[in-house]
Amino acid sequence: MFRRRRGHDQDQRHPGEQAGEGSRYLLREKLLSIGDDFWIENDRGDRVFHVDAKALRLRDTVVVKDMGGTELVKLQKRLLRARDTMAIERGRDTVARVKKAVIAPLRDRFTIELTEGGSLDAMGSILDHEYQITRDGVPVANISKRWFRVRDSYGVAVAPGQDDALVLAVTVCIDHLTD
């Protein structure tokens, strides 16, 4: 699924643009890195996003940047809430809130409330780290740790026409909320 094909000229999309057949990404955290920074690669092995986890803050803050260093989204874990919640912001606007279900035996469940209206649902296996994100029952993305033998690596397959940066931000939120 994630074969390295550097120098392949067929698909010259910019990071975050949607492809006709969907997009695939690899999130691979660096073990023992200060602040848990890591890169997100596309299916050709090219680095397309940088995830900067801010260390030593009172609340968890994660920034997803493009390769030019431009901030695309900021993720912030909200403290003192009845259930775990992370906000996804673009600029100064909150675009989504990821909330973990209070009780979900044997499965992780999340609701992603979109400020533009509507919501996404994410459900997956606690043990296998396999998740599916849906909108009204229609798959938006599949997230899998099983695709890789390397610890702390996720594969993300995003359906066509979706906001790749938002889906990747939701993936990072799910990872933080399940730790």
PLM feature segments, named:
Residues M1-D179:
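Intrinsically disordered, low-complexity proline/glycine-rich segments
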